[in-house]
């Protein structure tokens, strides 16, 4: 029999129908809304946006937060390492609140901000405690959107990556390759390979002796990420909210390719994830083919949907601008276009 923490909370069917049939929370961008299923973020789905610092992850979160507040839904914003930019959010709300209405009917920005709850969770313990007790939140039935800004920071603080981690993984892969090669080798090469495996075993022993905590740290990090993923999946299933998570990228050195950026969270994070959007930029001042100059690279951002449901598959790169009034579409670039960025799209997949 499953314990109470592993059982989903039963909910009326009518509430589930109303939640999943409700319109999504848009980005004010047709390209991004289409990439997330046609109407933006939908309730019951976990979406992630990852990218290097300054790529516009928080700007996307602010945009959908403003649209969710304007729709009358309550929003919970979890801040980890930096406070929510309230002035930018207020500016987005002011730009969308009609100014031609009568004073009695006009929706005040402060009234909209009353629907926003900010939770400060600077470390992993705070994150886990908040997610485990999410069903005890006030106004639970009114919550439509959950934002977790920079989830990767608490994980990094709890289990920081180090060069020993990559050395351990590299040695483990090399040992596995040598073992498989030894099994399929011919008889005349058996003696030579056994000597190599003997040295490899000594290296493994020395490595384990000097880095006894490396494997434990890696396993604990993976377990923590898996726990967060399971808790978020439980929240979407029981509370019918849309979850939007922003994360950072990390560098990885690949033989023959060099350094590349990959999402920080490991592959077990993808099990319950519905959408993963990767942001990047191009530092170019070239003109487009039609002769029109492109916007400044400081405002223009590119995106690629690294994971999405098969029914929503879109093989294209997205380009949008970050402006003071919000997000604006620029263009959609097919992936087979001759104008490709320097780093391959596949290099961004974990």
Swiss-Prot record:
Its main location: nucleus. The keyword Acetylation does not apply. GO terms for cellular component: cytosol; nucleus; Rad51B-Rad51C-Rad51D-XRCC2 complex; Rad51C-XRCC3 complex; replication fork; site of double-strand break. Keywords: ATP-binding, DNA damage, DNA repair, Nucleotide-binding, Nucleus. It is found in: Nucleus. InterPro entries: HR_Repair_Mediator, P-loop_NTPase, RecA_ATP-bd. ATP binds at residues 51-58. GO terms for molecular function: ATP binding; ATP hydrolysis activity; ATP-dependent DNA damage sensor activity; DNA binding. GO terms for biological process: DNA damage response; DNA strand invasion; double-strand break repair via homologous recombination; meiotic DNA recombinase assembly; meiotic joint molecule formation; reciprocal meiotic recombination. SUPFAM superfamilies: P-loop containing nucleoside triphosphate hydrolases. Gene3D superfamilies: P-loop containing nucleotide triphosphate hydrolases (3.40.50.300). Transmembrane segments: none annotated. Residues 331-350 are annotated as: Disordered. Belongs to the RecA family. RAD55 subfamily. Required for radiation resistance and meiotic viability and acts in recombination and recombinational DNA repair pathways. This is DNA repair protein rhp55. The gene is rhp55.
């Amino acid at each position: 029999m499953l314990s109470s923490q592993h059982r989903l909370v039963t909910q009326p069917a009518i509430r589930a129908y109303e939640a999943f049939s409700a319109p999504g929370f848009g980005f004010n961008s047709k390209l991004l809304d289409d990439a997330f299923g046609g109407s933006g973020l939908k309730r019951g789905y976990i979406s992630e946006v990852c990218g290097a610092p300054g790529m516009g992850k928080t700007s996307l979160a602010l945009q959908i937060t403003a649209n969710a507040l304007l729709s009358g839904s309550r929003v919970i914003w979890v801040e980890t390492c930096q406070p929510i930019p309230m002035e930018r959010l207020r500016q987005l709300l002011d730009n969308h609140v009609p100014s031609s209405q009568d004073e009695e009917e006009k929706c005040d920005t402060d009234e909209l901000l009353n629907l926003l709850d900010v939770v400060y969770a600077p470390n992993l313990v705070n994150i886990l405690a908040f997610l485990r007790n999410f069903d005890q939140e006030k106004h639970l039935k009114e919550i439509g959107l959950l934002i977790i800004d920079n989830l990767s920071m608490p994980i990094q603080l709890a289990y920081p990556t180090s060069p020993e981690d990559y050395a351990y993984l590299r040695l483990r892969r090399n040992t596995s390759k040598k073992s498989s090669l030894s099994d399929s080798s011919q008889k005349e090469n058996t003696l030579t390979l056994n000597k190599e495996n003997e040295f490899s075993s000594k290296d493994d022993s020395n490595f384990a002796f000097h880095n006894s905590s490396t494997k434990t740290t890696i396993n604990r990090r993976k377990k923590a990420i898996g726990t967060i993923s399971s808790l978020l999946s439980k929240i979407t299933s029981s509370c019918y909210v849309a979850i939007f998570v922003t994360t950072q990228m990390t560098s990885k050195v690949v033989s023959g390719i060099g350094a590349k950026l990959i999402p920080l969270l490991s592959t077990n994070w993808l099990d319950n994830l519905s959408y993963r959007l990767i942001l990047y930029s191009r530092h170019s001042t070239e003109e487009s083919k039609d002769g029109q100059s492109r916007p400044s690279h400081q405002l223009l951002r590119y995106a690629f949907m690294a994971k999405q449901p098969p029914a929503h598959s879109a093989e294209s790169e997205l380009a949008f601008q970050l402006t003071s009034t919000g997000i604006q579409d620029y263009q959609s670039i097919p992936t087979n276009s001759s104008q490709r960025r320097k780093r391959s799209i596949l290099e961004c997949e974990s």
